[in-house]
């Protein structure tokens, strides 16, 4: 290199010769170094080790600092083997870039390059460099704009939400622990609100056949390890059979069967009366009148029977509710009395005042007075 060029860097006339008048720091923190690369690379113009490489337009965005539209000279990058297309994409690779000997040690340019590498960390792992493909095989040596894109941060919430599975269709072994707890709570709420005491006891026997239930128990704890796929299947089928909707369906079926039987009896009577009218033409009008009267009476009786059936069903429901309420009150009173006795016994045992207690029974025999007693004396 010429001595004049080194003197230009060592003893510059201007305080900052590497930055042109256009290169300035704006208020937004953007550094425009459009002529920086050309002046920097001119010191190595005569180095035969560097391969000619056409000027590129490149953009860098790192930590809020933008270097835009910089025309670099052909010797800014080191020699690249143009035979392989993938080598052009490795210009920004950390390992390949650090192996480039752009500036020899001891030169002013090496100091400038070290300051550049200090200002822009090329091995910054926070960025994922995206380099669009350039058509090198067709003779185009111009690289596209290199735009760093910030990858997705792992701390950002994932937009994909887990779909809520239908637990009524899953076997017990296929559920997670949270799903098992959730499904047990759902079954407990459904059974306790929609079924009677007998159905609840049956379901408890299905889940745990060895369970001991006393009349004073008001709750039953279901252990997760007691349930299996087969038991859960039986519980589901039992709930499906004894649900309130199924009970209403069975009651309506009983009503329809009863009304059908009564209707068949009425129709048999009408057929017999019509056959009698065919034998005796003289009494045909009377038989038809009797048939119409019997039909109307049958309709009335069927209506009354339906009303009586619904009334009896409502009365049975009221009686069952009343009995269950009384049973609950009795159980509550018994439980309260037992708790009171236990609390009293615990107090007596803690105080120690009744350790030597003896219970004595005293009986007084009253003598019958034969004569009258004068109370005035």
Swiss-Prot record:
Pfam families found in the cross-reference section: FAM199X (PF15814)
Domain of life: Eukaryota
Residue stretches of biased makeup (Basic residues): 319-338
Region Disordered, annotated ranges: 240-350
Bias type Basic and acidic residues, positions: 240-254, 339-350
Low complexity composition-biased segments: 256-301
Keyword vocabulary terms for this entry: Coiled coil
Coiled coil stretches, renumbered: 321-349
Signal peptide limits: none
Family: Belongs to the FAM199 family.
Name of the protein described by the UniProt record: Protein FAM199X-B
Organism lineage string: Eukaryota, Metazoa, Chordata, Craniata, Vertebrata
């Amino acid at each position: 290199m010429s001595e004049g060029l080194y003197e230009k860097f060592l003893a510059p006339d201007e305080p900052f010769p590497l930055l042109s008048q256009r290169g300035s720091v704006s208020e937004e923190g953007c550094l425009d170094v459009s002529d920086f690369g050309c002046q920097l690379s001119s010191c190595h113009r005569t180095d035969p080790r560097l391969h000619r490489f056409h000027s590129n337009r490149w953009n860098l965005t790192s930590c809020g600092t933008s270097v835009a539209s910089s025309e670099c000279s052909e010797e800014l990058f080191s020699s690249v083997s143009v035979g392989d297309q993938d080598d052009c994409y490795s210009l920004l690779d950390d390992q390949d870039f650090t192996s480039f000997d752009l500036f020899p040690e001891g030169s002013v340019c090496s100091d400038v390059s070290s300051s550049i590498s200090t200002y822009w960390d090329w091995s910054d792992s926070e960025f994922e460099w995206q380099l669009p493909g350039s058509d090198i095989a067709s003779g185009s040596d111009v690289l596209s704009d290199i735009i760093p894109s910030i990858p997705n941060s792992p701390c950002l919430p994932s937009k994909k939400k887990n779909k809520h599975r239908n637990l009524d269709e899953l076997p017990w072994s296929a559920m997670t622990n949270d799903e098992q707890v959730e499904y047990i709570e759902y079954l407990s709420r459904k059974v306790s609100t929609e079924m009677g005491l007998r159905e609840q006891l049956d379901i408890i026997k299905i889940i745990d056949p060895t369970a001991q239930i006393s009349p004073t128990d008001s709750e039953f704890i279901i252990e997760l390890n007691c349930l299996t796929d087969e038991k859960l299947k039986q519980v589901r089928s039992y709930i499906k059979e004894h649900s309130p909707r199924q009970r209403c369906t069975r009651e309506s079926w009983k009503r329809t069967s009863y009304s059908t039987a009564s209707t068949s009896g009425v129709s048999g009577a009408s057929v017999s009366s019509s056959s009698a009218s065919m034998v005796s033409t003289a009494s045909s009008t009377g038989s038809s009148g009797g048939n119409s009267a019997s039909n109307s009476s049958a309709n009335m009786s069927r209506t009354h029977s339906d009303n009586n059936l619904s009334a009896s069903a409502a009365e049975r429901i009221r009686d069952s509710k009343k009995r269950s309420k009384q049973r609950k009150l009795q159980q509550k009173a018994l439980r309260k009395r037992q708790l009171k006795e236990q609390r009293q016994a615990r107090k007596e045992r803690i105080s120690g005042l009744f350790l030597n207690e003896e219970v004595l029974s005293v009986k007084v025999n009253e003598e019958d007075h034969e004569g009258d007693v004068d109370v005035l004396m």
